């Protein structure tokens, strides 16, 4: 056997003849949202289970990170029993303490052996099979043998030790989602929670993590001047971390286009919950959904493949939580608290079957697995909700969405054309749909004409170009109304589409938007006050930020598509970065380390890399 561990960021291995201090059938590392229910489910299904937690208590971000409310994620499963019990209890002032009590009772009842204050230090492997872990208990390193090991550390602490391909952040730029520090306060009437984006953080860089966390705490503590602060979360809210190459991969394009894997581990439920505002660097298909079709808050059932929790080529180890084999967009979606509870319960159930039957995780009796998780209620969620506008506060009824070009065509005459635009994009009869849209380009109603041009443009039809150019010449701050938040501006969408189907003659106009300081003085950028419908923050000029970033990305695309020299364009972006004027116009009241100015620098840095003939895209690799 060998032990493999990380030393200075590198995987190293050494031969050993281990003496086991503890043995179990299922070992779960991490007692957060997923790990707690994974351990409990494995024990209830007959396995001998050990649960290790690095911290002094359990609950993870749900308890220690103040993430106690629910956003999306399906109901169903064991967590509902604990929620109900905690709701009815009146023992503690702090709800998190109540929930923790019932989590501990659950583990005790199912027979899980819980060890807090244990830090995993190495993996024990035999060939391509993980046989357990080494952990430090504060005094010595102990060896634990297990038939199945579950990495429920959220950031893939164990997966990082494996020689598998790993990555983080989006494919272009490698940037991860912004982090938050959750704070609770009393505003004179109610106790409330705030979780505003606090900038970008590298969770694997100790110096960056410490510096950014302290800055975020300093910002949050300003609430003391206005309200009665109760507490700041002891855990930093990192939304995105390590991903790995698994036996299967969860891809956002498969979800958006309705492809389902043969064996589904469980069904998650969320909108494509991407934080941050630099949509100009997103993948084109994602932009089509989120920006052009204005479907930011459309919630989707997400089928997570069984193989997405299994590192490629390895046996005896799986993950539970947001560290999985997925792209950045899916990792951001499959992280809702309720879904983490349910995912943990499903993984724990499958792990117990694998351990007791001496079978690999992916080769267990799938029908038996389905029977167990469906009976427990943690597998499918509400099967009537495929895709639709859902409202987490339940203050409005669920609105199902059907993508049918003929049925949604009338929406192009309204302020809510998003479903019709995506239906046109994904229509099987592209030619006939495009011809119907082209007829609308002659409409006298500018709303209908502009909507039709956007739908035609997203299909790649250049007949949309004259109207898109007209839209931009008359650019304004009109925004679509499909969503309860994050609605997109029509002018921004037109700029985005020019990048896809525009021509060299569009370069001067786009350059004026990006590089001419007089652009910022236009009335459209100083008309709207912050609003939850499109952008609720006062930390930046949100419309100008979107126009400039999408304009810059469009310029680069046109240059590349037509094989134009990019040296002058690169120098123009370099000047913007060095002068710092752009980030000051975007966010004049922010510090350099705050999210808006940081995003402006990220944008310019990626534009410079994209125009460098010798440069390569900065894809996040771990």
Model-assigned labels for residue ranges:
Residues 89-90, 383-426, 436:
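C-terminal domain-closing interface element
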Residues 399-410, 429-442, 461-481, 503-536, ...:
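Amphipathic alpha-helical scaffolding segments comprising HEAT/armadillo-like alpha-solenoid repeats
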Residues 40, 44, 346-356, 457-458, ...:
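Short glycine/serine- and small hydrophobic-enriched flexible loop segments
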Residues 30-33:
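Glycine-rich Rossmann-fold phosphate-binding loop(s) that bind the pyrophosphate
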